[in-house]
């Protein structure tokens, strides 16, 4: 609403009868009759800001016209014809214009809702009134209750009822309270009998349902409707929610991972809402740092749900109405038991009042409040989570900038909002299912550039699920972008997938500790979970091998690939999960023959950790019992031993070109090395040659030429100590754990038989 409404009564008293006079005459008459405290400011406006005065006059005229229109509808003729009554059409257009431009106050919505549902006017008029019910701020719960009471009278048509339910679902988050509406749950449920109303009533019930609303007779009714109408998505949604609260009452199988149950009810009002947001758009706020404590977010000028501005935190019952004399005793008693969110300032305060907190009507406001994030994470109230996920899904879809071309100018606001979501997910150490659904829907449309950092961070927080289900929805599309993008994008994707693997492993490691492994149902579940993790690792291995070919064995890319396998090699020991997956040959041999010392050092460390994990797995009796379940076969040990033999041959025994490594003999002959088959070791390896030269120059600084082949015997041991002193800890761990120091050097492999 425009701010001029607050002085409406004063201006009405000062309005003169000189309607045909000029604006200056009217302003003079109004200026003389103002209070002395206000006259100075008003006079200043009149002298220095004539444009503002004209705008003020236009807004006041618009406000007056709206009041006249509302008064006309409130006292208007019964069953007036729209086509014949020009006055009616004039007032309808006035209401529509103001609603689309500024939104309507809660008092005006209260009056117009009663008019639309009371049947005073024709069906066409009622439809137009309902379509322009756009709130400026909030909608009063009492207005909704009175509107629902008109449905019992039966004076409005079926199409009007459908439109009202669609409006109620679309505006659900902007109703100031829900207690009285929830008491009408039985009435709404009875409306499921109407086939036209059923989808929208199901959606409303889905938003309202609490555990106490789930009754056996309602379950039977829903099952009867499903048998009559078939597997309708809206019925499945309500049944799924009922099954969550009372699994014993519902034995039928329901889809587990269905993403979309309801059609978007906001489509009718989308244009008007966008107009309100455009008019009231304020400057983009800076991203907020999520800290433990209340968030002091300054309210902005926006009057509608917008992703670029998180809703301001307001308790549904902490309003100015608490001081009104006409408030009922029951309302006072109900409100006295709840703790206002505005007064929540510290974590101890949260613990003391956790039993009497009342969450806000706009659930999106919890994103900026770490205390409320703690609350919804600990309490796990399903209706609360459903409300939050519904809000998040709708707003992500509304504001995603690559869905709509005209939204690119708001890219910074959308980016800031995604940053807020990511901070909340990091704070909770858990991903939101609404973001997962958003990724599945938007990835095919994503160009790989817009909001890249935020998008890939959302990928890393996808909740754990079956890889086979996620792959066609996400990873297949991601692979197409991966192969056709720059090396920097490839590295970003690998980093994101490493974080995704870490989050999945943390979730599974916590889950396995909360439940006994000896329970047979869990064994099956854990085996399936390990299979999903294994498929994710193999998927990254496939991406990495192909990327190395595309990027000509780029060292920068190889660093990110080995970072991923540093996480993979320690799954068994660090996360206590029965899984060991080796890297593919294309990655192993690329790293082994790399010219970069840090790459080879990193490979040595990974091989050392693989050895530790496989040795621990071999000794563990639990793994022996569940060997077939978790695929700890001799093939894994044989593959590791083969890698180990190749590494020792390249770094220690000077026998590199055995099984697994092939280089064209013509290329080897061009190197000019006489006995190339016996020349590659820790001294002659291309990545260590500079170290060998530096070592020899330290011993004999006066020498003009050096012979690296002279490093043998005692010099060999001194040279190793020199390498270890240069920070090559991976090489040090590998040689000390995997090389047998004797007169005949050989690799210390792992016995792949059942007996260790």
Swiss-Prot record:
Inducing stimuli: By follicle-stimulating hormone (FSH).
InterPro entries per record: CENP-I (IPR012485)
Subcellular location: Nucleus; Chromosome, Centromere
GO BP field: CENP-A containing chromatin assembly; chromosome segregation; mitotic sister chromatid segregation; sex differentiation
Pfam families: CENP-I (PF07778)
Record's comment on post-translational modification: Sumoylated. Sumoylated form can be polyubiquitinated by RNF4, leading to its degradation. Desumoylation by SENP6 prevents its degradation.
Region feature (Disordered): 1-60
GO CC annotations on file: cytosol; inner kinetochore; kinetochore; nuclear body; nucleoplasm; nucleus
Bias type Polar residues, positions: 10-28, 35-50
Keyword annotations from UniProtKB, A to Z: Centromere, Chromosome, Nucleus, Ubl conjugation
Family the entry assigns: Belongs to the CENP-I/CTF3 family.
The protein's assembly and partners: Component of the CENPA-CAD complex, composed of CENPI, CENPK, CENPL, CENPO, CENPP, CENPQ, CENPR and CENPS. The CENPA-CAD complex interacts with the CENPA-NAC complex, at least composed of CENPA, CENPC, CENPH, CENPM, CENPN, CENPT and CENPU. Interacts with SENP6.
PANTHER family: CENTROMERE PROTEIN I
Protein purpose: Component of the CENPA-CAD (nucleosome distal) complex, a complex recruited to centromeres which is involved in assembly of kinetochore proteins, mitotic progression and chromosome segregation. May be involved in incorporation of newly synthesized CENPA into centromeres via its interaction with the CENPA-NAC complex. Required for the localization of CENPF, MAD1L1 and MAD2 (MAD2L1 or MAD2L2) to kinetochores. Involved in the response of gonadal tissues to follicle-stimulating hormone.
Protein name: Centromere protein I
Organism of derivation: Homo sapiens
Lineage: Eukaryota, Metazoa, Chordata, Craniata, Vertebrata
């Amino acid at each position: 609403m425009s701010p001029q409404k607050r002085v409406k009564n004063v201006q009405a008293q000062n309005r003169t009868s000189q309607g045909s006079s000029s604006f200056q005459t009217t302003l003079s008459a109004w200026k003389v009759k103002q209070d002395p405290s206000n006259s100075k400011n008003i006079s200043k406006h009149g002298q220095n800001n004539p444009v503002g005065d004209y705008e003020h006059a236009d807004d006041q005229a618009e406000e007056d016209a709206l009041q006249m229109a509302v008064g006309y509808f409130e006292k208007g003729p019964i069953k007036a014809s729209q086509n014949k009554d020009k006055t009616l059409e004039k007032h309808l257009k006035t209401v529509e214009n103001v609603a689309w431009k500024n939104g309507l106050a809660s008092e005006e919505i209260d009056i117009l809702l009663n008019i639309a549902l009371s049947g005073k006017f024709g069906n066409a008029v009622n439809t137009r009134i309902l379509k322009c019910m756009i709130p400026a701020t909030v909608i009063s719960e009492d207005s909704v209750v009175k509107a629902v009471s008109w449905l019992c009278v039966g004076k409005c048509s079926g199409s009007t009822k459908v439109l009202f339910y669609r409006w109620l679902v679309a505006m659900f988050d902007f109703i100031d309270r829900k207690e009285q509406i929830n008491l009408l749950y039985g009435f709404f449920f009875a409306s499921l009998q109407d086939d036209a109303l059923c989808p929208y009533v199901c959606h409303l019930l889905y938003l309202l349902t609490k555990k106490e609303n789930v009754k056996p007779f309602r379950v039977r009714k829903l099952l009867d409707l499903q048998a009559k109408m078939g597997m309708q998505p809206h019925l499945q949604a309500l049944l799924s929610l009922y099954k969550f609260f009372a699994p014993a009452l519902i034995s039928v199988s329901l889809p587990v991972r269905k993403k979309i149950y309801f059609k978007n009810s906001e489509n009718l009002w989308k244009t008007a809402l966008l107009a309100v947001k455009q008019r009231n758009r304020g400057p983009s706020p800076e991203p907020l740092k999520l800290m433990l404590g209340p968030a002091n977010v300054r309210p902005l000028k926006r009057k509608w749900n917008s992703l670029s501005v998180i809703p301001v935190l307001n308790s549904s019952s902490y309003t100015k109405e608490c001081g009104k004399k006409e408030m009922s005793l029951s309302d006072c008693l109900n409100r006295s038991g709840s703790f206002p969110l505005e007064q929540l300032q510290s974590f101890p305060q949260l613990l003391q009042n956790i039993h009497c907190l009342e969450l806000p009507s706009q659930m999106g406001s919890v994103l900026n409040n770490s205390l409320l994030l703690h609350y919804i994470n600990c309490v796990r109230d399903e209706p609360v989570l459903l409300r939050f996920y519904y809000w998040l899904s709708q707003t992500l879809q509304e504001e995603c900038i690559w869905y709509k071309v005209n939204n690119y100018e708001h890219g910074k606001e959308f980016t800031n909002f995604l940053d807020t979501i990511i901070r909340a997910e990091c704070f909770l150490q858990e991903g939101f299912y609404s973001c997962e659904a958003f990724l599945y829907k938007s990835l095919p449309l994503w160009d790989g550039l817009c909001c890249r950092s935020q998008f890939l961070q959302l990928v890393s927080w996808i909740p754990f699920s079956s890889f086979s289900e996620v792959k066609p929805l996400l990873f297949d599309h991601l692979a197409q972008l991966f192969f056709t993008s720059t090396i920097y994008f490839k590295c970003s994707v690998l980093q994101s997938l490493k974080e995704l693997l870490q989050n999945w492993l943390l979730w599974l490691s916590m889950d396995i500790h909360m439940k006994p492994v000896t329970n047979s149902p869990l064994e099956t579940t854990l085996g399936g979970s390990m299979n999903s993790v294994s498929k994710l690792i193999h998927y990254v291995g496939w991406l990495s091998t192909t990327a190395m070919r595309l990027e000509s064995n780029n060292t920068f890319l190889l660093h990110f690939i080995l970072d991923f396998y540093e996480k993979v090699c320690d799954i068994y020991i660090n996360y206590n999960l029965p899984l060991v997956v080796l890297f593919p040959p294309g990655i192993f041999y690329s790293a082994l023959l790399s010219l970069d010392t840090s790459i080879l050092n990193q490979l040595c460390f990974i091989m050392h950790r693989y050895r530790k994990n496989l040795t621990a797995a071999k000794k563990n009796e639990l793994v022996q019992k569940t060997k077939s379940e978790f695929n700890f076969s001799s093939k894994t040990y044989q593959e590791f031993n083969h890698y180990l033999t190749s590494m020792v041959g390249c770094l220690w025994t000077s026998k590199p070109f055995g099984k697994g490594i092939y280089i064209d003999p013509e290329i080897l002959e061009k190197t000019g090395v006489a006995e190339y088959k016996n020349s590659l070791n820790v001294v002659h390896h291309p990545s260590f040659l500079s170290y060998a030269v530096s070592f020899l120059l330290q011993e004999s600084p006066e020498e003009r030429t050096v012979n690296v082949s002279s490093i043998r015997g005692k010099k060999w041991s001194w040279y190793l100590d020199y390498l270890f002193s240069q920070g090559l800890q991976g090489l040090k761990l590998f040689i000390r754990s995997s090389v047998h120091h004797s007169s005949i050097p050989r690799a210390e492999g792992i016995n792949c038989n059942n007996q260790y």
